[in-house]
Amino acid sequence: MKRLLYGLCTLLTVATILRTAAQPAETPPTPAPGSAAAAATTSTTPTSAFEKRPVALERDFGRLYGTLTVPARGAETAVLLIAGSGPTDRDGNNRLGIRSDCYRLLAEELTAAGYAVLRYDKRAIGSSVLDDPTQLPELTLDQYIDDAAALADYLAGEGFRRVVLAGHSEGALIASVAAQRSPAVAGIISLCGAGYPIDEVLRLQLAGQLVPAHMELFVEVEQIIAALKRGERVDMTYHTQGLQALFNSGVQPFIISQMRYDPRQELRKAQVPALIVGGGNDLQVPADNVEALAAARRDARKCIIPGMAHTLKACAETTLEGQLHTAYGDPTLPLAPGLVQAITEFLGGL
């Protein structure tokens, strides 16, 4: 049942976006050189090994902002790094208290290996604020997908011969669908991506919590999920209070859009080479999700990194409480050994 944690985490983080994304982005103070804080956020990759460029792309809501790192000697392949669910920024941190720097570290290590990497704040997250905040409750997964496809086209327009989409968690599904919408995409990488559709995950998870003791509540859940699956919004006024919070009107458009996609089918439809990566200690999206995706794309490479948590970090902890203080809360932890090698071997074969 551990794999079913993914669904509830997705809904809770979507709700958090709606509460926090309209607030001005907070800029953390710059640590003093030589301080402990500065040491904690310093990459082991020397900045002289690459050039860092700001990116701003006009979209229908405003601008997408990101950071492009390019090797000093240049690169033929560019990787677009797509963040996971919740208000997670381009570096892999968010206001829920997650501080991992995992995307920044991955971008810098891949750039040191010879690949350009663009990481960005998704729509309504970080610096990519909405010009019209009233549109926030209408946020959908399809908008994220179109944004990723537009950034892939942007990278191709910048002269990179190959563009690869690397999506983490929810970003893996975004990558699979965006690859179908942009002819620039030459490959996709699923990093701890779910292998099951969100409605299936939610049904199984909530059944495990509610059946048989609360059958009447589970029947209510089934009715709500079935309506959302049909694309119908649900008036939660007369539903149980706990379900009102989980399926509130502000998150329903996003859930409905997410339910249109089965990660296995979308990976199968993406007609580009694929790498599927999972973590041996991932408590949010355990390794059986890798097998589910691999069964849909038997030509894809797959790799389960021993000891890797959902944040792509090396972590010996196998409890959620233990990981919250380490993999999710300690930016000094390194990326899991073997992760960068698995990615660069895939990129080198394209």
Q: For the regions a protein language model found, what residue spans apply to each?
A:
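N-terminal cap/lid segment of alpha/beta-hydrolase-fold proteins
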Residues: 40-74
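Short, surface-exposed "cap/lid" segments of acyl-processing enzymes
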Residues: 73-74, 79-110
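Conserved alpha/beta-hydrolase
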Residues: 101-129
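Alpha/beta-hydrolase active-site loop
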Residues: 136-157
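Primarily recognizes the serine-hydrolase "nucleophile elbow" in alpha/beta-hydrolase
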Residues: 153-208
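Accessory cap/linker subdomain of secreted extracellular hydrolases
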Residues: 189-264
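Short beta-strand/loop motif that positions the catalytic acidic residue
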Residues: 270, 276-278
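Catalytic active-site module of serine/aspartate enzymes centered on a nucleophile-bearing elbow/loop
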Residues: 311, 317-350
